[in-house]
Amino acid sequence: MAFSAPVIRAFSQPAFTYVVKFPYENWKEEEHLLWSLLAPGTERLMIQLRNCAPHPEDDPVREDILCSLADQHYGAIFAKACYIATTTLMGQKQRTPFPRCDIICQSEIGSEHLHCHILVGGAGLSKRNAKISRATLLGLVMAELTQRCKQLLALRPFEPAEANIFHLLKRIEREAWSGHTGNWVQILQYKDKRGDLHAQPIDPLRFLKHYILPKNRLISPSSKPDVCTTPDNWFILADKTYAHTIINGLPLLEHNRKAYLQELESEVIPGPSTMAFGGRGAWEQLPEVGEQRLITSNASTAYKANKKEKLMLNLLDKCDELNLLVYEDLVSACPDLLLMLEGQPGGARLIEQVLGMHHIKVCAKYTALTFLFHLHPDQLLTSNNKALKLLLIQGYNPLQVGHAICCVLNKQMGKQNTICFYGPASTGKTNFAKAIVQGVRLYGCVNHLNKGFVFNDCRQRLIIWWEECLMHQDWVEPAKCILGGTECRIDVKHKDSVLLQQTPVIISTNHDIYSVVGGNTVSHVHAAPLKERVLQLNFMKQLPQTFGEISPVEIAELLQWCFNEYECTLTGFKQKWNLDKVPNSFPLGDLCPTHSQDYTLHENGFCTDCGGYLPHSADDFVYTDVASETTSGDCDPGNLGDTDGEDSKSEASEVDFRPSKKRRVISATPPSSPVSGPSLSTFLDTWQSQPRDEDELRIYEEQASQLQKNTKSTPEREEAQLGEPQEPQPEPDPTAWGEKLGVCSSQQPGEPPVVLYCFEDLRPSDEDEGENIGGE
């Protein structure tokens, strides 16, 4: 018999409310999978519940089923997992296994997701860390659910559909430990004057009274509330439902719910009679108010905006809310508001003024890097990122380049305020530069054709793009100020000169930007100061035509990973990469010894030191796991029960902030090649260190025994060869060599020779047999 939770009379402060969603989209259509995974043994009862009659009809079978499913259905299991995870989180905050806190968890069946409301309060949780704790809470909940699934795995192997849900829970858990919640957990927040969101403390008892308790019971989307709720516990005006409620570890039973609510209203939460009404009761006569007189004042009344000004204010709010930066964005996002403003006198100029004000506001609030993250939040770096691959092809460490770009875009690189991509055509210069500036979106371009106003488009911008930069003596002096991040005044057409703040510059060119052209002379006087302001990357390798364009999202993924991992300042960059001075020519990358590839095999992830792709294993059988077989569609029920697959190839393919472990490359003997032993040098090169697991130990013992057999049989073969008489063999002529190679001369003159067989069928010689096993 379950004990019902007593009425909670005081709740620990501060208190916050979370909502955790079950990360499976099609759970309603495949509800039977949740029965078998989370609540095995309840399938028959849940099916019988569908056929039960709703109240007020008497159905004894319905009462027995609901009594049997009291806290055994999957909604109750989900609520228990959330309660255990929240208790663990508060224990971490208070650094004790027995935290002093109050926790209320209620699972509900929503219109889209199965979710759980969590009310938690106690020491260690504050407005500053409650929002950050979402990822930790999600990871703990997913860990509890996967542990519940493993209990079923001890009894029987998973079905393919069950294995998909299990691996989905494991993936969400790994992403949560990396800081990515994926909108699977939320917290009640409020927005301040600057538009930032913060965690909102709540009154937990009133939240419990008005939102949590007055709901009817529903434990399955295929059933109805009037079937799952008894008539005595029915809330007439309630239109929302719940599945299971836990208060401080004890379940709140259905028949105690109304009594709990009544006691909470009458005794715990103060009613109107106890509120401050100046000593009077709630329904007594209000105090009399004396005669009020208006005080005459000479002060002017508040100003009321006219229609045109209200339209401008509304448009400015829309630009801030939807990140509208150019006229085309206004046309696509709010055409009605744009038409109303265009209809006003001087409407086109008013729209330009509104966009200009919004640009000033964005430039004052963000840097190019923070605005890029604002437009592309919570991006996860994957190994098939084209920006990563391009930098590897050009010989650079992509993580080091990303670190430098973060410092420049965040205005933390000192005097080096410019990144220049230099090289011949079709090497990816413009591709990379365009992805950066399009990711920021608020950028200006330098126009050589308008020689009097070259930097006319660079004011009120987060970043400047100088495509095919060419340095001329007419603008070399303001260019040095802009490239170095120094404030200067620039000329604007039809306006006075304006002040240009520090703005990062991206250059893509195949010209020598350090040579200043003027008339018929070329000067190198400005080369040294220009090199001190520019960080140059030389792209010299041409890309294939099928490489594709780098998207702004891929740039955001790379920069966000670097921003989270490194200190994006000049000091942090120099300390991380052991540099005394950041040179003009960016240093090339130094790949790890095992990461020298052709940058094609990227499924194993990337190295967090050199940025190169992790090598693949030559023995596919050793590193085959359940997750890869499940996603490819070849499901083996025997292998689905192997929980070791969660740490193998599936984790390596899902690249997050925790890179995959490096593996030893062990070559397997090709099936078509003859059985031959490894050579001693190849064997020693391969096994320079001890085997790290059972598979490598097995391969090591096989190769060692084969090498020992070859060593013993070598003297016997030499003696047999010395005993046989050697006959002189004539040297073959070109025709004989052609027959050995599988090429015979044609019978008809003038026709090409006939190829009899392929070179792949030739048996390897004795000298090459030792190279087939044990080495790459």
Swiss-Prot record:
GO molecular-function terms, A-Z: ATP binding; ATP hydrolysis activity; DNA binding; endonuclease activity; helicase activity; metal ion binding
Gene Ontology cellular component list: host cell nucleus
Polar residues bias spans: 703-713
Main subcellular location of this protein, as a coarse class: host cell
One BP annotation, GO: DNA replication
Record's catalysed reaction(s): ATP + H2O = ADP + phosphate + H(+)
Domain PV NS1-Nuc: 11-271
Source superkingdom: Viruses
Compositionally skewed regions (Basic and acidic residues) per UniProt: 646-659, 691-701
Motif (RCR-3): 211-215
Binding site for ATP: 423-430
Region described as Disordered: 628-752
Motif (RCR-2) on chain: 115-117
Pfam families linked: HBoV_NS1-like_N, Parvo_NS1
E.C. designation(s): 3.1.21.-, 3.6.4.12
Region (Ori-binding): 193-197
Biased composition (Low complexity): 667-681
Subcellular location: Host nucleus
Keyword terms, alphabetized: ATP-binding, Covalent protein-DNA linkage, DNA replication, DNA-binding, Endonuclease, Helicase, Host nucleus, Hydrolase, Magnesium, Metal-binding, Multifunctional enzyme, Nuclease, Nucleotide-binding, Transcription, Transcription regulation, Viral DNA replication
Positions of the SF3 helicase domain: 397-552
Binding-site positions, a divalent metal cation: 108, 115, 117
Region annotation Transactivation: where it falls in the sequence: 606-776
Subunit structure: Homooligomer; when bound to DNA.
Annotated domain remarks: In the N-terminus, the endonuclease region is involved in binding to the origin of replication. In the middle, there are the ATPase and helicase activities. The C-terminus probably contains a transactivation domain.
Role noted for this protein: Multifunctional protein which displays endonuclease and helicase activities required for initiating and directing viral DNA replication. Also plays a role in viral packaging and transactivation of several promoters. Binds site-specifically to 2-3 approximate tandem copies within the origins of replication (Ori), unwinds this hairpin region and nicks one DNA strand thereby initiating the rolling circle replication (RCR). Becomes covalently attached to the 5' end of the nick and provides a 3'OH for priming DNA synthesis.
Protein name per its UniProtKB record: Initiator protein NS1
Encoding gene (name): NS1
